[in-house]
From Swiss-Prot:
Native source species: Vibrio vulnificus (strain YJ016)
Top-rank taxon, per record: Bacteria
InterPro entries reported in the protein's UniProt record: Hfq, LSM_dom_sf, Sm
Entries under Pfam families matching the protein: Hfq
Signal peptide: none
Described purpose of this protein according to its UniProt entry: RNA chaperone that binds small regulatory RNA (sRNAs) and mRNAs to facilitate mRNA translational regulation in response to envelope stress, environmental stress and changes in metabolite concentrations. Also binds with high specificity to tRNAs.
Protein name: RNA-binding protein Hfq
Family of the protein in this entry: Belongs to the Hfq family.
Compositionally biased region (Basic and acidic residues): 71-86
Region (Disordered): 65-86
GO CC aspect terms: cytosol
Alphabetized NCBIfam families for the sequence: Hfq, PRK00395.1
Domain Sm: 9-68
């Protein structure tokens, strides 16, 4: 798994597993809504009244309808390094 996906995959998996409704905003401004049925390295399958395959490179933002409890299982890649001078 690529280092850049260590946060993305657990987040999307929590949305899928808990069937949390999401709004997905595309880079062209279009808003899609539904539930994440599945995803891989390149696409997200979004389910609503129809299934839509959305390419990740076209996505700007994923907004859950409610808070998500996800645990990455990775070492805190979102935390500052120990050498940071705060």
């Amino acid at each position: 798994m690529a280092k850049g996906q260590s946060l993305q995959d657990p987040f999307l998996n929590a949305l899928r597993r808990e069937r949390i409704p999401v709004s997905i905003y595309l880079v062209n401004g279009i808003k899609l809504q539904g539930q994440i049925e599945s995803f891989d390295q390149f696409v997200i399958l979004l389910k609503n009244t129809v299934n839509q395959m959305v390419y990740k490179h076209a996505i700007s933002t994923v907004v859950p309808a409610r808070p998500v409890s996800h645990h990455s299982g990775e070492r805190g890649s979102d935390r500052p390094s120990e050498k940071s001078e705060d």
